[in-house]
Regions:
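Conserved beta-strand-loop-alpha-helix junction that forms the acyl-donor binding cleft
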Residues: 86-96
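Conserved beta-strand in the GNAT
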Residues: 37-46
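Conserved acetyl-CoA binding element of GNAT-fold acetyltransferases
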Residues: 48-61, 87
Length: 139
């Protein structure tokens, strides 16, 4: 996969549409394109507060190590964040399996975050600077 930069609004809209959510600016985005230059997914970063930034991501295929390193480099090296947060619907079991495999830790369940039904609760995960450095930057 090839990484695409400089098309934040287009990528954020594509990710939001794929996930059925609206992503509000300000944000920065990295797109994932296939060999034919078609954007197949993306990572959108928003709600930056100096210490934390949130990740909204859509990737129809497996997430590659190169992609994870690009995300970790942006968040922990360029922005110098202490943590990266990711929320997913309780019903999104693939994300809940993948996030811990790449170093995210469960933090909380957020009741009725996406809607009334229990399947619309959110699950909050965090990747901290120490884990990111050990697994993705220095490892």
């Amino acid at each position: 996969m090839r990484l695409i930069f400089g098309h934040d609004e287009y990528i954020a809209n594509a990710v939001g549409q794929a996930l059925g959510v609206t992503i509000h600016p300000p944000y920065t985005a990295i797109g994932f394109a296939d060999a034919s230059e078609v954007i197949r997914g993306g990572a959108v970063f928003n709600n930056y507060n100096g210490s934390n930034i949130e990740l909204t991501m859509f990737a129809p295929r497996a997430v590659t190590k190169g992609l994870i390193r690009a995300i970790v480099n942006y968040v922990f090296v360029q922005l110098e964040c202490n943590r990266l947060s990711a929320r997913t619907k309780r019903s999104n079991k693939p994300a809940q399996v993948m996030l811990p495999k790449i170093g995210f830790k469960w933090e909380a369940n957020l009741k009725a975050y996406y809607g009334k039904e229990k399947s619309n609760d959110a699950v909050l995960f965090c990747l901290d600077r120490k884990t990111a450095s050990e697994r993705w930057l220095n490892g």
